Design a protein with these regions (language model features):
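Terminal-appendage/accessory-domain detector
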Residues: 1-240
Length: 240
């Protein structure tokens, strides 16, 4: 939104500075403000073997701009009625993460009408966290406190997964890819497309790679996407 164009910036750092390396990749199909909290819930759930049934309350602390978008007003955020509602509801994202160990695109269809998930949403609270506010806007951080009969379990995630400083592993990136293309491409074509994209710098015919991305006409029965999951018992990857 500069008042005038600056032609010099078009070639500034050309060939030496790669802006794409500064781009984050969202592991979850929800508002980015929710991601640090989802990471924290995944980490605590794995480390403490927390089951959704034992959760009395989850308190998520957010920077104020994020809280206004995904935490307020609390009654509405605890009762999402559509996919967009769910994407911008910290309560819904947290409830799904508690129940599944993550959040994938198919979870909206599975959980928006699920009574147990919606009941769990009522136990998710949000607040403005001073520490997260101090880290903002450099980071979109979050604090998480899960209260159970066994006690309280807390964590603070400063850099959410997917940021350049905490990027997805190769397997996590592939899991996101599979979750998105799974309903539209057969496995063999998805594998070929993934190989083509990863070797794009060596491609002689970019059109051949793009043609692999054309969806086929599939049967009416949807295929569930793999999504981005934290398998129970697998070591969680985190750099905080």
């Amino acid at each position: 939104y500069a008042p005038a164009a600056d032609a010099a910036k078009v070639v500034d750092g050309l060939g030496t500075r790669w802006e794409t390396l500064k781009i984050a990749v969202k592991p979850y199909p929800s508002c980015r403000y929710s991601h640090a909290a989802i990471d924290g819930i995944r980490d605590l759930g794995h480390a403490q073997a927390i089951s959704p049934e034992e959760v009395k309350e989850v308190m998520v602390g957010l920077p104020e701009p994020g809280w206004k978008i995904i935490g307020d007003p609390e009654p509405a955020k605890q009762s999402p009625a559509s996919v967009v509602d769910g994407q911008f509801s910290m309560a819904f994202c947290a409830a799904v993460a508690l129940r599944t160990g993550g959040l994938a695109w198919d979870d909206y269809a599975r959980h928006l009408g699920d009574r147990d998930t919606l009941a769990l949403c009522k136990r998710i609270r949000t607040r403005i966290d001073p520490k997260a506010q101090a880290d903002f806007p450099a980071e979109m951080s979050a604090s998480v406190c899960i209260t159970t009969a066994r006690g309280e379990f807390e964590t603070y995630v400063r850099v959410p997964k997917g940021e350049p400083a905490n990027f997805l592993t190769a397997s996590e990136l592939r899991a996101k890819f599979d979750g998105l293309v799974g309903p539209y491409l057969p496995r063999e074509r998805a594998d070929a497309l993934a190989r083509g994209l990863l070797a794009l710098d060596k491609a002689r015919d970019i059109g051949a790679v793009l043609r692999l991305a054309s969806p086929e006409v599939r049967s009416a029965e949807p295929r569930l996407a793999a999504g981005f999951r934290l398998a129970r018992g697998r070591q969680a990857n985190s750099t905080r």
